[in-house]
């Protein structure tokens, strides 16, 4: 038999499934031990009637005890339909699995009402097993609630679940056991399973017969219904002793055996069913010699916690000493049950008799109050005519309830089925009842006692007969157990043999398939060899036939060979001729290659010449464009000169009229000023001729350097413009942030911050104007070259007629200085590029300031002229001086204003970043120049275009755009 080693705590009962012998319908023990025998109407309250609390507790306690003590209780065949089979603590795994399968099949194939009854009985039995097994009931109830849906709703047949109550104290007390995975493989049932199934079906057939027998026995013993009550009370007390203790009677005596039993419980070693049955028979035979007194203590420790009913046992001592047993025991160490020591059941048909029976005993007050309460709360009727008594208390009672010597001698052992009587009847049988001072015993009480004694005697006789039958059953059980072992070993050997044979068959099959495959391969190989042999034979026969043909073919080939040799000689001669011809062709090809290379070289030279000519053509086109621009500029200048001439003529007429209306002496002023004016006109014409010569020279220089400087100027302009914009943005952003921070920190320096901002704005505008300067440099070069060309043309010719008025000629007073400056700049340009740029910028600025200085003289209104207090002669001389001085001062001061320190500008890069006419360079020098000009009367008009304009001469000034057109 297999063992399921389940660990549990010292206070938890071991829940076992009943042994297979319990299911034989022929054993008489199951008639006594079946709860339906003593309580035929102890049924499931599945209708609308609600049972009372005490009745449900009593019936549930009885079921719990009948399940929890498998040693002293054998179950009827209808036990298989009850839920106690689902308690998983059995040591015999095979029988437990068989019972699980049987209940599952009953739930699967039974009627819905039977299934619902089975499930309800499971929950009721596991939920009302008693207060001492709360943890076990909790875990088993949880396990059943987890398993019930699987039982009811699974359609396929399943193997046993194999869910055992395993684990230590903490697992049993605190955790719900998890269900193990189910096995769905279909297997043949083992011997135990088939045996249990056959017993189950036989038990179902004989169940109705047993119920009829039980009802007949109840009717025969219906005269003393209390006898059943007392008998069952003793039985339940006997069960309470051995509750949860599979190894109770293994020890002899003493505390050491008790410790050993506890140790065995902790280690989880559980004896098999055969050992327990043998020990039962031995203890029954020698019960008087070997009573395990220590088993009581062990059953107490295994049963649960001590109940508060121990002082009740002490209070019952005045009733009299307990009956003398044939051996010594320790009554104080014996465990007490969970409730009162009265194993008293009452029926609602005899409430008065029970109450009168309790009265003569001087029991303590708590027992009386409890019995009185039970009297006034009888369980309701459930439609049963002949009812035995219900359980007023939970079914566990005190172990050492006093009883008669006969009953103690028969039923003193723990595992016998003799059931001791409770306290009142045993006292009446052993000694006379003590007389109470308040009450006297009536004849009814004595009659009840006599009837009880008669019932006790009848029951003891029946018990003795049943003991004999039980002994026979034990012997049969031992034999059956041996048979079971042998059959199990045979079945195991058979299973191993089946496994080995199946394994051998599989190996044989594999070898057979392997050999068959090898045979097929060899057959194929043999077939291939035969085919090859046949082909070889055919080839050999064909070669012998071909030998004769080869001889004839050889003679034919010899004749052909001679012919081929003759043809070969002819072809060699032709080949030599072709080689000579090919050499001639190669020489001709080389000659043609040389001619082709020469032609390609000539083509390359022509292409280069073509590029040069195209470049000359482009230059000519550019010069033509410049010529057209110059012509347009000359036309514009002529128009401007004409306008100036008309304006000067008007001014002259105005002066003449003023002179006529004025005093007499100034009339001689024009006569005196005429030679001076003619001299000024001559000087201006000479200056014009010099400027034209310079223009031709500058045009030649421009033609030489325009191709070189064009790309460099464009790249430099783009790079400097980009760099200047990034620097200006960076400087403006940073300086604005810093200045704003300083304005917050130092409010007294707001003026300094504003000045810094103005300087930054000025720098930004300067950098924007720098790009314009580069463009102006290019235009200056063009004008200088054109002036050189024109000067070369007009040198041989005489002086051209003056197209300008004397006022324009007066503006060319410093021609000698300007020509010397430009000539010196030209010599420096030939030496170094830096001086070329400086000279060109100086010349441009000189021309600009010359034009700007002469322009304010032109648009002077007659009103401003009338406001002059001077005479006509003095005014004309002033004009002449102003023109000459303006031109001279502008050419002289231009280098001072815009080139204050030439040594501080070492390279062209510095000039590009800081332009020559930037306000940074102009600002301090301009102040000095203005201060110098303010001291002299003529220099103020030259500096008035910078921002300090006089009210007399600077009102209608020409715009910058018109001056640019004049320069072009």
From Swiss-Prot:
Q: Which residues carry this modification: Phosphoserine?
A: 253, 281, 307, 731, 804, 816, 840, 912, 918
Q: How is it modified after translation?
A: Polyubiquitinated by NEDD4, leading to proteasomal degradation.
Coiled coil feature spans? 271-291, 449-645, 676-705, 748-773
**Location in or out of the cell:** Cell junction, Tight junction
Keywords from UniProt, A to Z, are: Cell junction, Coiled coil, Phosphoprotein, Tight junction, Ubl conjugation, Wnt signaling pathway
- Free-text tissue specificity from the UniProt record: Expressed in exocrine glands, including pancreas, submandibular gland, lacrimal gland, parotid gland and sublingual gland (at protein level).
CC per GO annotation: apical plasma membrane; bicellular tight junction; cytoplasmic vesicle; lamellipodium
The question of whether Acyltransferase is a record keyword is answered with no
Q: Where is this region: Disordered?
A: 152-258, 285-343, 721-742, 785-834, 853-956
Record's compositionally biased regions (Low complexity): 203-224, 853-878
Tell me if ATP-binding is a UniProt keyword of this record. no
GO MF terms on file?
identical protein binding
Query: Composition bias, kind Polar residues: at what positions?
Result: 152-164, 177-187, 726-738
Motif PDZ-binding mapped to chain: 965-968
Q: Name one GO biological process term.
A: blood vessel endothelial cell migration
Q: Name one Pfam family in it.
A: Angiomotin_C
> What family does this belong to?
Belongs to the angiomotin family.
What's this chain's function? Inhibits the Wnt/beta-catenin signaling pathway, probably by recruiting CTNNB1 to recycling endosomes and hence preventing its translocation to the nucleus.
Name of protein:
Angiomotin-like protein 1
Query: Which organism does this sequence originate in?
Result: Mus musculus (Mouse)
The organism that produces this protein has a lineage beginning with: Eukaryota, Metazoa, Chordata, Craniata, Vertebrata
Q: Which gene encodes it?
A: Amotl1
């Amino acid at each position: 038999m297999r063992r399921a080693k389940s660990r549990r705590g010292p206070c938890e009962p071991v829940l076992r499934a009943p042994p297979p012998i319990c299911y034989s319908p022929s054993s008489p023990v199951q008639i006594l031990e079946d709860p339906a025998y003593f309580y035929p109407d102890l049924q499931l309250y599945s209708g609308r009637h609600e049972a009372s609390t005490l009745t449900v507790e009593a019936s549930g306690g009885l079921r719990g005890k009948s399940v929890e003590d498998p040693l002293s209780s054998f179950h009827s065949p209808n036990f298989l339909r009850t839920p106690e089979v689902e308690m998983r603590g059995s040591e015999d795994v095979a029988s437990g699995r068989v019972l699980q399968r049987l209940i599952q099949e009953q739930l699967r194939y039974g009627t819905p009402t039977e299934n619902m009854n089975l499930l309800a009985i499971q929950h009721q039995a596991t939920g009302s097993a008693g207060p001492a097994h709360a943890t076990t009931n909790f875990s088993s109830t949880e396990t059943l609630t987890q398993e019930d849906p699987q039982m009811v709703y699974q359609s396929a047949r399943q193997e046993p679940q194999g869910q055992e109550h395993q684990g230590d104290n903490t697992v049993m007390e605190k955790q719900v056991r998890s269900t193990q995975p189910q096995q769905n493989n279909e297997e043949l049932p083992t011997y135990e399973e088939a045996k249990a199934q056959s017993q189950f079906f036989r038990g179902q057939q004989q169940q109705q017969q047993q119920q009829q027998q039980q009802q007949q026995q109840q009717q025969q013993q219906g005269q003393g219904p209390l006898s059943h009550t007392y008998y069952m009370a003793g039985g339940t007390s006997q069960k309470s002793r051995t509750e949860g203790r599979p190894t109770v009677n293994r020890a002899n005596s003493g505390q050491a055996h008790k410790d050993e039993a506890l140790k065995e419980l902790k280690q989880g070693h559980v004896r098999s069913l055969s050992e327990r049955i043998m020990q039962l028979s031995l203890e029954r035979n020698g019960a008087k010699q070997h009573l395990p007194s220590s088993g009581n203590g062990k059953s107490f420790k295994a049963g649960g916690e001590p109940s508060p009913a121990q002082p009740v046992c002490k209070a019952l001592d005045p009733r009299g000493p307990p009956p003398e047993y044939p051996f010594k025991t320790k009554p104080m160490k014996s465990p007490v049950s969970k409730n009162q020591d009265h194993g008293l059941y009452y029926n609602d048909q005899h409430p008065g008799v029970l109450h009168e029976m309790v009265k003569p005993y001087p029991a303590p007050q708590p027992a009386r109050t409890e019995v009185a309460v039970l009297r006034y709360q009888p369980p309701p009727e459930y439609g049963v005519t002949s009812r035995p008594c219900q359980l007023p208390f939970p079914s566990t009672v005190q172990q050492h309830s006093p009883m008669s010597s006969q009953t103690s001698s028969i039923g003193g052992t723990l595992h016998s089925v003799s059931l001791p009587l409770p306290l009142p009847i045993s006292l009446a049988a052993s000694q006379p009842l003590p007389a109470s001072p308040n009450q006297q015993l009536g004849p009814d009480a004595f009659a009840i006692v006599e009837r009880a004694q008669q019932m006790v005697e009848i029951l003891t006789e029946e018990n003795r007969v049943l003991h004999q039958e039980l002994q026979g059953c034990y012997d049969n059980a031992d034999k059956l157990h041996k048979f079971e072992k042998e059959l199990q070993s045979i079945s195991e050997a058979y299973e191993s043999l089946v496994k080995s044979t199946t394994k051998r068959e599989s190996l044989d099959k594999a070898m057979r398939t392997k050999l068959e495959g090898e045979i097929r391969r060899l057959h194929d190989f043999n077939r291939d060899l035969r085919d090859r042999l046949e082909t070889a034979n055919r080839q050999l026969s064909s070669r012998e036939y071909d030998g004769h043909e080869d001889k004839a073919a050889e003679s034919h080939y010899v004749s052909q060979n001679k012919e081929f040799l003759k043809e070969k000689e002819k072809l060699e001669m032709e080949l030599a001729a072709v080689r000579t011809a090919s050499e001639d062709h190669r020489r001709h090809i080389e000659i043609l290659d040389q001619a082709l290379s020469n032609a390609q070289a000539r083509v390359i030279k022509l292409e280069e010449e073509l590029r040069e000519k195209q470049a000359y053509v482009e230059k000519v086109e550019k010069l033509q464009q410049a010529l057209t621009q110059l012509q347009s500029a000359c036309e514009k200048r002529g128009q401007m000169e004409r306008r100036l001439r008309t304006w000067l003529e008007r001014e002259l007429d105005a002066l003449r009229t003023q002179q006529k209306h004025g005093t007499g002496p100034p009339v001689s002023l024009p006569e005196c000023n005429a030679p001076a004016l003619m001299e000024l006109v001559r000087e201006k014409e000479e200056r014009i001729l010099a400027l034209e010569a310079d223009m031709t020279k500058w045009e030649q220089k421009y033609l030489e350097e325009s191709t070189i400087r064009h790309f460099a100027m464009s790249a430099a302009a783009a790079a400097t413009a980009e760099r200047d914009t990034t620097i200006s943005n960076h400087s403006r952003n940073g300086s604005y942030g810093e200045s704003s921070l300083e304005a917050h920190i130092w409010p007294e320096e707001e003026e300094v911050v504003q000045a810094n901002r103005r300087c930054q704005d000025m720098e930004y505008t300067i950098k924007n104007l720098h790009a314009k300067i580069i463009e102006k440099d290019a235009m200056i070069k063009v004008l200088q070259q054109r002036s050189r060309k024109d000067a070369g043309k007009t040198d041989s010719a005489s002086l051209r007629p003056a197209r300008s008025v004397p006022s324009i000629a007066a503006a060319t007073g410093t021609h000698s200085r300007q020509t010397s400056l430009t000539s010196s700049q030209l010599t420096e340009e030939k030496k170094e590029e830096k001086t070329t740029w400086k000279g060109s910028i100086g010349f441009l600025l000189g021309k600009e300031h010359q034009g700007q200085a002469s322009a304010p003289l032109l648009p002077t209104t007659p009103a401003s002229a009338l406001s002059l207090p001077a005479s006509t002669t003095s005014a004309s001389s002033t004009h002449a001086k102003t023109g000459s001085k303006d031109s001279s001062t502008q050419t002289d001061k231009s280098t001072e204003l815009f080139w204050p320190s030439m040594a501080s500008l070492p390279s062209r890069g510095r000039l590009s970043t800081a332009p020559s006419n930037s306000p940074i360079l102009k600002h301090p020098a301009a102040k000095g120049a203005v201060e110098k000009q303010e001291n002299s009367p003529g220099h103020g008009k030259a500096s008035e275009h910078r921002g300090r304009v006089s009210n007399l001469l600077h009102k209608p000034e020409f715009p910058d755009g018109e001056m640019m057109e004049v320069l072009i």
